[in-house]
Curated annotation (Swiss-Prot):
Residues 78-146 are annotated as: Disordered. Residues 1-78 form the TFIIS N-terminal domain. It holds the Pfam family Zn_ribbon_TFIIS. PANTHER family: IP08861P-RELATED, TRANSCRIPTION FACTOR S-II ZINC FINGER DOMAIN-CONTAINING PROTEIN. This is Transcription elongation factor A protein 1. Belongs to the TFS-II family. GO terms for cellular component: nucleus. Residues 78-106, 133-146 have a biased composition (Low complexity).
Amino acid sequence: MQEIIKCREQLEKAIKDGEFDKALECLKNAKNFKITKDLLKSTDIGKSVGKLRAHKDIGISSQSKELIDKWKQDIEGTSATTTSSSSSSSSSTTSTTTTKTASPSESLKRKSISEDTSDRPTSKPLLQENKKISPPTTPKTSSPPIASLIAPITGANADLRNKTIQLFVEALTTDNDETMSPPEDIAVEIEAEMYDIYRGVSKEYKEKLRSFKFNLKKNDILRLSLLNRQISVAKFCSMDIYSMASDDLKEERKKLDKFNTEASMLGQNNEATTDQFQCGKCKQRKCTYTQLQTRSADEPPTTFVKCCVKGCGNRWRFC
């Protein structure tokens, strides 16, 4: 028990200090322990390892899942063995007690019966026939769920690439577990496709990462389509911001396009007059607006609006 407690303390310290290599070593050493249900409760190692299944480091989360599954199998196997041995011991004790408590008269009766039937042909007992008909059953154990394990990338830019995969895993994770592919597999494929397209971790690679992560978090339909293989990874990596946008965002952009085309007048600063915006201060719809590209080129422009009502002059902006 002391070894398990020491391993748990070392694991918690390594996680707290950010020493992930030491944490992985502790998880691997924990596989050698003979774990029981009582040990998990008394040492609290089950709680410590269970929390790490959702850790940001892929290696630690994978090893934690693997270790929990192994412990489940060990505990189920121990429970089945204990039940079998206790039932066997109980039946043996009952048989012995019955034999010892038999009265002398019953012994004489059995002796006389055996003498009368000694000349008869012997036959197999009915109990043996029944045993042949119904063979002994073995307790069934549920197989552990198959966890998706990701081998960390090594070589040039390994840290950045592994971080990219982790960000994609977070963006792809949903409450729906019944998907064709786990988020980890899709994240690895997207990163590999981006790395090939942009020939390394370039400026374009990083810009695309930010754009993909933003749109995946905002668009549930796009996220599920990727996880269910309704959209291929290659097609996803070739999509622009307009293709990845959710239906609500597409509708909003259509309105902005309409505002641009229906603008009645342009000022010196390229300001368009419209009645499509309502001022939050005076509640009137006399406004001018202009659009500027304040962020990267693959993101929508920022719209600046000014109320034209005399005495108001309220200003606001939105993306």
